[in-house]
Amino acid sequence: GLAKAAKKADREVFEGGLRIITDADTAYIISVSCETDFLANSDKFKAMLDVVAAFLKENGESSRDEAQKLIESNYSLEMGENLQIKQYEIMKGWVVAAYVHSNGKLAAVTVAQVGWDEVKLKQVAMHVTAANPEYLSPDEISEEVVEKEKQIQLEMMKNDPAMGTKPDEVLLKIIDGKMGKFKGEVSLLEQAFVMDPNVKVKDFLGSTK
């Protein structure tokens, strides 16, 4: 079985799924890749994800190699595809909430101090899977990232017939005025909350401890 599974391990993997188990202040996160969407959506693949997540919870992050062997010996041959662990992680916090999208391929975990509303944290995790923020707040965005975005915007404006004739100095002033919007769009707390676009995530959560 393992020899045949080893042959399958040479094949490329493009699909997969993930599973998150939460228990008190800890989240156990695993993702396993496979070759086809058909298998990724099957009940047997989803059942395997449950087993691997439980194995992580029982044995800790250091058991990743053992978990991969478990998959190869018990599932790869039966499923007929190359199955590879892509994520095998434990997250600890005071309050942990997780959301896994219905397709089993998108998920987010929110971790906060004691006192936060777990239901709200789960809704924010749902927001993260939809809005894909890159930072928690604008303060975390480096000047290097901002400068790179400015150059991207500058090139776009130069290629715009209505703006391209203006001097770079003028264009950069216009771009500087747009950086606040850019920072807000990529920062979780400043994003419009997907369940109520009229409020920002930070306002939905209340005080940001």
Locate the predicted segments by residue:
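N-terminal assembly/interaction segments in proteins that build large macromolecular machines
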Residues: 1-209
